[in-house]
Amino acid sequence: MKKKFYKYGLFYIGVVLAACADNADLNEPTGSTTPPSQVLNATVKNLPGAAIIYYDLPDDQNLKYVRASYKVDNMIRTVNASFYTDSLVVEGFPTKGEYDVELYSVSYGEAVSTPLVVKVSPDTPPYQKVRGTLISAETFGGIKVNFDNPEKAKLGLGVIKKQAEGIWTQVYMHYTEAKGGDFYVRGLDAVTTDFGIFVRDRWGHLSDTLYVTETPLYEEQCDKSLFRKMALPTDSYECHSWNEVTKGNDMTRLWDGITDTDPCFQTKTTTVLPQRFTFDMGEKYKLSRFVMVSRYYPGKYGNTFKAGHPKHFELWGSNDPNPDGSFDDSWVLLSEYESVKPSGGGVNDALTTEDQEAAKNGENFIIPDNAPAVRYIRFKTNDTWGKTRYMHLHELTFFGARHN
């Protein structure tokens, strides 16, 4: 009986070894140098600046992957797709038109089949389509540019400015994958200026330039020496006790110019959200934007993008607030906001270099052009990054123009 089991065992081992030998090419990186069969029945779905090529894979065990090769911008580009999929994407075409794409079947030994030539006809690429949607307008301290990007393509929108000596220089580049929106170029003098706006894609293709002439509106930083805190009955204007006792910390710390160490303004831990605080700017301003610095410490970044850092909040304005603290018609909503890490990370994600710069220099928020001129500001915190009951801020800096 033992001899029979021994013989059968040798037989099964021999079968397994033979099977492995038959498939050696599939497991050996150097594999076979025999070219595999071509892919079959290729069809095309054309897209803006790109195309998807679908195909049937050959019944060939020597096939490792499919390679697409095509020429654009006097360069040969290649795209590889494994044998686990039946399609691939070719992209980066500079203009609408017809292009030849060669499909190769590639073996485990990197032997290639004869090419199957497929014609693709990509639509107008996103960088050209977005160029046709650009609209500029003057705004405080610069210009505002609106764009539509329905494909959510990765693009750069550049702004150039004509200098006094007639030389054009780039003053801003806005990178986006958004479906559309606005971006602002700030820090410019309130003089009539020639600008150019163009679009660049990730392959370096440039659109033609939209030339415009705009006169940026005068903008200045609001005078913080005139700011005064208010103690409206329904507000959370009192600060957390340990700060109040040990460091004299209260709302006035929001405009003391100190952004790299305590004290800061932190509301009481016994409060609840949503909550609000109110202050008087001392003068009436047509506001354009503001910078918010949360609790930042050099090298440590404090509680920026965590703890009581406001996540979703609102900015309200008034010229004659009701002294009983009511949120009535004496207040107008200037805008709603969300604090977002430049990296797009969450509360538990490590801060990137961009996040750290935002922590140090503050987050910039735009006040809509149609917002009325106001003297009193009400900051309403709806929730925080750390889902706390309180909020904390180091500094608020507002910009705009005095309004008589």
Model-derived features: positions:
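Recognizes extended acidic, P/S/T-rich segments that occur
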Residues: L57, Q61-K96, I160-A190, W331-P342, ...
